[in-house]
């Protein structure tokens, strides 16, 4: 299981291998705390939830990194474009077996129309919501292009335009 967070200090998306961290917990009890912090950070939507501080060590000195929801960098991720090309350039053979990508996007792809109240906070909220939606679409296109380039079977599930349940509140 891979989970993404955003290191706000570095303005970088970080992908965590949660399986490896869980396995490390057998010999390193602090790995369980890191696992929990990553889970919290991955859901820490800026301004809605507090960021999560993660302890790190650089050149023998302790630091803390501020992590929030990985969606501030990428709504959906697969692997870096051109990864297979880079691996091949290093002389590593890549097995040519069939590969598939399955993406579950917990959102609609079409824009939702709404009258926007003429207030600063409402306008800002709607603008941020629009940014998030377009970033998500861009991420899907990027993953599709990567899948095509690498010969992967691309599969996408999302909430269709025919879904009409009433939205009562955020995070419901």
At which residue positions do the language-model features occur?
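Patatin-like phospholipase
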Residues: 1-172
């Amino acid at each position: 299981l891979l989970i993404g967070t955003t290191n706000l200090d570095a303005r970088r998306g970080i992908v965590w291998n949660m399986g490896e961290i869980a396995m490390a917990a057998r010999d390193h009890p602090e790995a369980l705390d890191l696992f929990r912090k990553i889970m919290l950070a991955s859901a820490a939507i800026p301004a809605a939830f507090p960021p999560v501080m993660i302890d790190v060590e650089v050149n023998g000195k302790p630091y803390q990194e501020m992590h929030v929801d990985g969606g501030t960098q990428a709504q959906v991720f697969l692997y870096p474009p051109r990864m297979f090309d880079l691996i091949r350039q290093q002389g590593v053979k890549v097995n040519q077996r069939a590969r598939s990508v399955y993406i579950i996007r917990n959102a609609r792809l079409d824009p939702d129309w709404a009258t926007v109240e003429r207030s600063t906070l409402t306008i800002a909220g709607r603008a941020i919501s629009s940014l998030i939606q377009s970033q998500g679409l861009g991420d899907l296109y990027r993953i599709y292009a990567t899948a095509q380039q690498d010969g992967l079977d691309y599969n996408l599930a999302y909430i269709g335009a025919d879904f009409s349940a009433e939205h009562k509140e955020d995070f419901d």
